A protein has these predicted regions:
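Cyclophilin-like peptidyl-prolyl cis-trans isomerases
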Residues: 3-277
Length: 277
């Protein structure tokens, strides 16, 4: 028996209600799927911080410094190393570093981390690796396809990531770096790693440069490179291979290693030959 309510067939009412629910559910699922797809696309887009064109990469770090190039001379308690600066590629980070060096900020700061022969971290006024204030710690990260984490590269450390609500949901954000810096030595390039690097790199020249010169490929396009060591590589190697005490995120040297000073100048072949700064 059919029940008639207000002159309408209740069976038909139930069928229409079910159909409506199915349509609503389908619409919700469609919107959800679209949101997931868009979210994945946005994540991919936002995580691709820089577009690399293998045809136009210039591996400038493999070139010797030229007369008049800006340089930094880092005098440590273990010796001195020198690197050429790249203001044309990382203008804001180089300006921040240069300003701090010229002000004497780096005088008697600490090498506060030494990572198993791979790299060292320097430039902290405190033994625990912290900075005294944030006034020079919010420089937007600058990436460039011509700068890579080869052995001897100097990179400024990432300090923070700022994200909007949308970026927290879908990925992306703005990375910042500051005063402290890494000086890279190298990871080990065994045969398997060399093969993997050659197969995964879009640029044959870049892969071969890492294999020949060393470096830390997994840091590629992850932090701002400001310079490339051209003198004192033995000091770079020592700084990366210190005996350490593990304490939280840092491996502190067992014995204090000090950055006595960082001097900004210009490259002169004559000065290099005579040992002048």
């Amino acid at each position: 028996m059919k029940i008639v309510c207000n002159g309408k067939d209740n069976t038909m009412f139930k069928k229409n209600h079910v159909v409506r629910l199915v349509l609503i559910f389908t619409l919700i699922m469609g919107v959800s799927s679209l949101a997931v797809m868009l979210g994945g696309t946005m994540r991919a887009r936002n995580n691709s911080y820089i577009t690399i064109d293998p045809e136009t990469i210039e591996l400038v770090q493999l070139n010797a410094p030229k007369e008049g190039d800006p340089i930094a001379v880092v005098d440590t308690s273990l010796g001195e190393y020198r690197f050429v600066l790249y203001p044309q590629y990382s203008p804001n980070a180089v300006a921040n570093f240069t300003e701090l060096a010229n002000s004497g900020y780096y005088n008697n700061t600490y090498v506060f981390h030494s990572e198993s022969g791979v790299y060292s971290a320097s430039g902290a006024p405190n033994k625990d690796g912290s900075a005294n204030d944030s006034s020079h710690e919010l420089v937007e990260r600058e990436l460039n396809q011509n700068l890579w984490p080869f052995k001897g590269a100097v990179c400024v450390m990432t300090t923070t990531l700022k994200q909007s609500f949308k970026e927290k949901c879908f990925g992306g954000g703005t990375y910042y770096n500051g005063s402290r810096f890494l000086t890279l030595n190298t990871v080990s390039f065994d045969e398997d790693f060399q093969k993997e690097l050659r197969e995964s790199s879009e640029s044959e020249a870049l892969a071969e440069a890492f294999i020949k010169h060393g470096g830390v490929p997994n840091f590629s396009q992850q932090m701002t490179v400001i310079g490339q060591t051209y003198s004192g590589m033995d000091v770079v190697e020592k700084l990366a291979s210190l005996e350490t005490n593990n304490a939280g995120i840092y491996k502190f040297p067992k014995e204090d290693v000090i950055i006595k000073s960082v001097t900004i100048g210009t490259y002169s072949e004559k000065d290099e030959d005579t040992g002048k700064k």
